[in-house]
């Protein structure tokens, strides 16, 4: 990486402007919210069990970090899979959630439990193919503040995202400027026809 550009040894001479953003960002759910997710997603699975409509908790594949004993077993049996975004945020994969963005998350537990991860150098909208991003390591710098009773005050149950005003330009072009001076050197006042001729 060099600034906002990256290159690859596999494609020499090509630089690519990225839009660095977290694929995953959100607050912790409370136990009631977690139980609601597991219930409604299991109900969806039950409508067509072989279609892969959702993924229930899976104790066999759960990564529980440093948890041990009963706490580990309970979390593995109840923990929501992180693929879908939910009311708390989660795996949102919004490519425009980059420098200058604002996010408003509902908070369900004391301390919010804000977490950020799955950093992408760039991706398409939604990372819909599960491999549509350029993954990266990095640090995230952000300012966090609390809107006291914000969920009740603004009636929100889901995150609100205000995307970054910074978007890379992937078109490669040059611009020819035309001015209001004709071929003989005569000056005109804001003459678009003369300016157009000079640009062409």
Language-model features, listed with the residues they occupy:
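Intrinsically disordered, low-complexity linker/loop segments enriched in Gly/Pro
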Residues: 1-98, 104
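General structural feature for long, well-ordered alpha-helical segments within catalytic domains
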Residues: 93-99, 140, 195-200
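Active-site lining segments that contact anionic ligands and/or coordinate catalytic metals
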Residues: 102, 137-141, 170-171
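A hydrophobic, small-residue-rich beta->alpha segment in the mid-to-C-terminal subdomain
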Residues: 157-200
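Short, Lys/Arg- and Gly-enriched loop/turn segments at beta-strand edges
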Residues: 111-121
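Short peripheral tails and domain-boundary helices/loops at the edges of structured domains
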Residues: 3-6, 123-152
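Glycine-centered flexibility sites
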Residues: 89-90, 100, 117, 124-126
């Amino acid at each position: 990486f060099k600034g906002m550009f990256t290159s690859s040894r596999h494609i020499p001479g090509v630089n690519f402007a990225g839009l660095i953003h977290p694929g995953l960002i959100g607050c912790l759910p409370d136990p009631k919210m977690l139980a609601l997710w597991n219930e409604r997603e299991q109900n969806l699975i039950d409508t067509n069990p072989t279609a892969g409509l959702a993924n229930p908790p899976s104790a066999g594949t759960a990564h529980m970090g440093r948890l041990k004993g009963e706490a580990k077993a309970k979390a593995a049996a109840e923990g929501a899979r992180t693929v879908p975004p939910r009311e708390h945020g989660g795996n949102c994969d919004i490519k425009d959630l980059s420098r200058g963005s604002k996010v408003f998350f509902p908070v369900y537990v004391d301390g919010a439990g804000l977490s950020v991860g799955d950093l992408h150098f760039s991706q398409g909208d939604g990372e819909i193919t599960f491999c549509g991003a350029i993954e990266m390591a990095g640090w995230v710098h952000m300012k966090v503040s609390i809107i006291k009773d914000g969920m009740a005050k603004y009636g929100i149950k889901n995150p609100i995202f205000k995307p970054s005003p910074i978007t890379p330009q992937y078109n490669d072009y040059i611009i020819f400027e035309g001015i209001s001076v004709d071929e003989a050197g005569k000056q005109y006042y804001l003459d678009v026809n003369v300016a157009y001729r000079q640009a062409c």
